[in-house]
Amino acid sequence: MGAPLSTTRRGMGQNLSVPNPLGFFPDHQLDPLFRANSSSPDWDFNKNKDNWPMANKVGVGGYGPGFTPPHGGLLGWSPQAQGVLTTLPADPPPASTNRRSGRKPTPVSPPLRDTHPQAMQWNSTQFHQALLDPRVRALYFPAGGSSSETQNPAPTIASLTSSIFLKTGGPATNMDNITSGLLGPLLVLQAVCFLLTKILTIPQSLDSWWTSLNFLGGTPGCPGQNSQSPTSNHLPTSCPPTCPGYRWMCLRRFIIFLFILLLCLIFLLVLVDYQGMLPVCPPLPGSTTTSTGPCKTCTTLAQGTSMFPSCCCSKPSDGNCTCIPIPSSWALGKYLWEWASARFSWLSLLVQFVQWCVGLSPTVWLLVIWMIWYWGPNLCSILSPFIPLLPIFCYLWVSI
């Protein structure tokens, strides 16, 4: 009988040269046909072998309970594939959501020098000048950050310039200032429009009053109607352009406008004279027209700062100049009064009359008040057209 192909035959499970994935070879050994006993190294001890991939490492019970092939097989080489159970740590419970615990505060933004260090390397002069503004500094260095020195907190009130162009998230503007700033001009505009409409009715009212003086029984119809220019019945104060009385109405209105303008000029002149803005020299006593040389008009200024003179000079016949101070108020009025008193001696009696009126008893004043009350309606009808001018005069008197 021939000798066997291999003299040495290893026991069961001793030959590890051939992989046994399915566990069909209990002794882990093949027939000599596969040259298992050759001089080639064992498979299990070959360093260049390819281990089983991780995909074959299935968990415990992948092929049913209690079935674990030897050496892992297709189930892999993990402890679970060998039938060894390990206890895995349980996952921590999920954190509570924001809906249950509430919104967490937003973390403070880090300074610019930490998040954008390249911006700190910019040596532009304009950039550093802009950082001098606390509002700009608060944008680049939040949460108390600073570039090199102590920073002031950003202001919470918008300035007048920044309130015009507001940014999103900027401080709210003060609506009280805006409301008060708009309410004043609106009230002034309303008052001006009201006075303008009233002033425009002054010529018509005065025209009616002027016409009524010619007709004591009442204002009749316009007498300017004729057959050549037939017009409807109307008052003489509202003649149409086709009426012959239209030119007379325009003439009366023009005279009324001149009268109102003269009244305003007189009021302005009185106001300026009251403020001392008319440096009119009073009548100089002892002045003569035969002087050999002129005298200075003014020597000093009022209080050293006023642009109006405070005294006037006169030169008598002997050639010496005499200075007379100008009144600080009512200079023109006093000049006119002294000039009129020098030519009309009876005007001096008015001074005594005024002084006498001041010393009247209360009974006389009550009598005067009763007369005004009795004749008041007629006086009001005459003076009513001038009532709209009263607020204007009062405003000018107070402002100037």
Curated annotation (Swiss-Prot):
Residues forming coiled coils: none
Q: A Pfam family for this UniProt protein?
A: vMSA
Chain segments carrying region Pre-S:
2-174
Compartment(s): Virion membrane
Q: Which residues lie on this side of the membrane: Intravirion?
A: 2-253, 203-253, 370-375
Question: Practical use of this protein?
Answer: Systematic vaccination of individuals at risk of exposure to the virus has been the main method of controlling the morbidity and mortality associated with hepatitis B. The first hepatitis B vaccine was manufactured by the purification and inactivation of HBsAg obtained from the plasma of chronic hepatitis B virus carriers. The vaccine is now produced by recombinant DNA techniques and expression of the S isoform in yeast cells. The pre-S region do not seem to induce strong enough antigenic response.
Highest taxon, organism lineage: Viruses
Extract the ranges annotated as region (Pre-S1): 2-119
Where on this protein are sugars attached?
320
Any domain commentary?
A: The large envelope protein is synthesized with the pre-S region at the cytosolic side of the endoplasmic reticulum and, hence will be within the virion after budding. Therefore the pre-S region is not N-glycosylated. Later a post-translational translocation of N-terminal pre-S and TM1 domains occur in about 50% of proteins at the virion surface. These molecules change their topology by an unknown mechanism, resulting in exposure of pre-S region at virion surface.
HAMAP family linked: HBV_HBSAG
Mind telling me what this protein is named?
Answer: Large envelope protein
Name the species this protein comes from. Answer: Hepatitis B virus genotype F1 (isolate Argentina/sa11/2000) (HBV-F)
Taxonomy of origin reads:
Viruses, Riboviria, Pararnavirae, Artverviricota, Revtraviricetes
